């Protein structure tokens, strides 16, 4: 998603909204959370939710603008966002793309296709393989 943001941030506004914790330590802890050291209890206050979001942004150097759902979970309820989901809202405020629920139906490549159709594809220069001369000069 960060690469998608970097590619299209000059054409579209991006926002990540932190909703309730997907795998909190006091509910359904995952081994991957322990491995990646992202272990949090389910926040009980907005201040706790803000602290977790700020920790995420800082630890992962996350560049996408961040919003935080309130404790009534209004954004989560309106967009069925938990545990993760992608949306494109068009310039008229209408939902132009509604992705499936993550993690299995979380498909940033579908958002990329929508953005490419709307704004044009972003080309990335491919890394060149080492030349044969460079490999033979080491022998």
Predicted features, each with a name:
Residues 1-60:
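Structural microenvironment flanking redox-active thiols in thiol-disulfide oxidoreductases
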Residues 5-8, 18, 40, 62, ...:
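Sequence-level detector for tyrosine residue identity
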Residues 9-13, 61-65, 83-84, 91-92:
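Loop/turn elements at helix/coil->beta-strand transitions in domains of secreted/extracellular proteins
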Residues 17, 67-69:
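Conserved beta-strand termini and adjacent loop/short-helix elements that scaffold enzyme active sites
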Residues 33-37, 66, 73, 95:
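General secondary-structure edge motif
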Residues 43, 64, 71-74:
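Gly/Pro-rich cap/lid or specificity-loop segments adjacent to the active site
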Residues 70-139:
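Thiol-/selenol-based redox modules, centered on thioredoxin-like
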């Amino acid at each position: 998603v960060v690469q998608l943001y970097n590619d299209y941030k000059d054409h579209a506004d991006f926002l990540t909204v932190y909703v309730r914790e997907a795998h909190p330590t006091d509910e359904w802890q995952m081994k991957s959370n322990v491995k990646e050291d992202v272990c949090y209890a389910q926040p009980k206050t907005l201040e706790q939710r803000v602290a977790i979001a700020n920790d995420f942004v800082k630890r992962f150097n996350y560049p996408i603008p961040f919003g935080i759902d309130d404790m009534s979970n209004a954004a989560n309820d309106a967009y069925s966002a938990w545990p993760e989901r992608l949306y494109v809202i068009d310039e008229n405020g209408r939902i132009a793309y509604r992705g499936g629920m993550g993690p299995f139906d979380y498909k940033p490549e579908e958002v990329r296709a929508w953005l490419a159709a709307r704004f044009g594809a972003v080309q990335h220069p491919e890394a060149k393989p080492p030349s044969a001369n460079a490999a033979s000069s080491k022998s």
